[in-house]
């Protein structure tokens, strides 16, 4: 029996056979619909299972990659060696007390935005169309339309690389543009508390509807993508720079600069991760040559080179 099969058996004892997959194609777990196989993919159903899996992998010196629902992720075509831990809808419980929502990392951020509205709480309207999980959103300080997670997050329970639970509060998060203390230290968000404000439900709903409509009009939501590919360069808009380079609709293989929004790359149906990565590099080089601006990716790129 192969070493990875033996490891998979051990992980099955922790998380259950139904939650462990061998040689799982990562294209089934990313919004871009690309990516080679993960040696082992596990979806833990509790914090205790997550901790046990991390400790097991550490003891065996097996690399671990933790993901949410794969909406901000490019996995290379050769896939991911070691263990991929997917924290999604198995860890999605939440509570609401007065003006504070506390929720586990696997819940969708858009769902948390809806929960806020249902409870007459304002502050998370910006998040209504962000497709990722709460955990990923907190780790990278996700934001849109003038709002960011740093505006509402007051406390986060996270797990360090050793499987131990830690807590950060307020400024301890060290939020920056698309980054945080937790991300910099490879922490795994377990649950987060967000402090909101009492608001008018009709006004909250109206703003959410407006932002949703703007997204639908301006973003290629009907095609596989990973949202905004690039961080916003200081003083510029990434999409505008790409458009001004004449790259709207530019294709490499099955990857295309979106006709609808130049800040997005879409999978036209048969893209490989290599097509997307080659297109990213082409865009970066073109923008650098024309405008002298360095474009940094917002999307996570992982997997065997």
UniProtKB/Swiss-Prot annotation:
InterPro entries: FAD-bd_PCMH, FAD-bd_PCMH-like_sf, FAD-bd_PCMH_sub1, FAD-bd_PCMH_sub2, MurB, MurB_C, MurB_C_sf, Oxid_FAD_bind_N
Top-level division of the source organism's lineage: Bacteria
Pathway: Cell wall biogenesis; peptidoglycan biosynthesis
Pfam families: FAD_binding_4 (PF01565), MurB_C (PF02873)
Names of required cofactors: FAD
GO biological process, one term: cell wall organization
Keywords attached to this entry: Cell cycle, Cell division, Cell shape, Cell wall biogenesis/degradation, Cytoplasm, FAD, Flavoprotein, NADP, Oxidoreductase, Peptidoglycan synthesis
GO cellular component: cytosol
Domain FAD-binding PCMH-type: 34-199
Annotated GO MF terms: FAD binding; UDP-N-acetylmuramate dehydrogenase activity
Localization, UniProt: Cytoplasm
Catalytic reaction list: UDP-N-acetyl-alpha-D-muramate + NADP(+) = UDP-N-acetyl-3-O-(1-carboxyvinyl)-alpha-D-glucosamine + NADPH + H(+)
Its EC number(s): 1.3.1.98
Active site residues according to the UniProt entry: 178, 228 (proton donor), 298
Protein function: Cell wall formation.
Family: Belongs to the MurB family.
UniProt name for this protein: UDP-N-acetylenolpyruvoylglucosamine reductase
Taxonomic lineage of the native organism: Bacteria, Bacillati, Bacillota, Clostridia, Eubacteriales
């Amino acid at each position: 029996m192969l070493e990875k099969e033996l490891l998979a058996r051990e992980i099955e004892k922790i998380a259950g056979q139904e939650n462990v997959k061998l040689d799982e194609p990562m294209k089934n777990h990313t919004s871009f619909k690309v990516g080679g196989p993960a040696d082992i993919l596990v979806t833990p159903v509790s914090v205790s299972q997550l901790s046990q899996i991390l400790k097991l992998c550490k003891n065996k010196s097996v690399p671990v990659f933790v993901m949410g629902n794969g909406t901000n992720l490019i996995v290379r075509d050769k896939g991911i060696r070691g263990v991929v831990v997917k924290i999604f809808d198995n860890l999605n419980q939440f509570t609401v007390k007065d003006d504070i929502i506390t929720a586990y990392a696997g819940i969708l951020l858009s769902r948390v935005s809806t929960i806020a509205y249902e409870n007459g709480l304002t502050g998370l309207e910006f998040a209504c169309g962000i497709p990722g999980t709460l955990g990923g959103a907190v780790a990278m300080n996700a934001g849109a339309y003038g709002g960011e997670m740093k505006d509402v997050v007051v406390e986060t329970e996270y797990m360090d690389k050793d499987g131990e639970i830690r807590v950060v509060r307020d400024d301890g998060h060290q939020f920056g543009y698309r980054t945080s203390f937790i991300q910099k230290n490879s922490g795994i968000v377990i649950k987060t508390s967000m402090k909101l404000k009492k608001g008018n439900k009709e006004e909250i709903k109206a703003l959410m509807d407006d932002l949703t409509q703007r997204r639908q009009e301006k973003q290629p939501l009907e095609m596989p993508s990973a949202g905004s590919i690039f961080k916003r360069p200081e003083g510029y808009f990434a999409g505008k720079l790409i458009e001004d380079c004449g790259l709207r609709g530019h294709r490499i293989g099955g990857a295309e600069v979106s006709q609808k929004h130049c800040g997005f790359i879409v999978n036209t149906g048969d893209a490989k991760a290599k097509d997307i990565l080659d297109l990213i590099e082409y865009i970066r080089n073109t923008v650098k040559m024309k405008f002298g601006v360095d474009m940094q990716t917002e999307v996570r790129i992982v997997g065997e080179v």
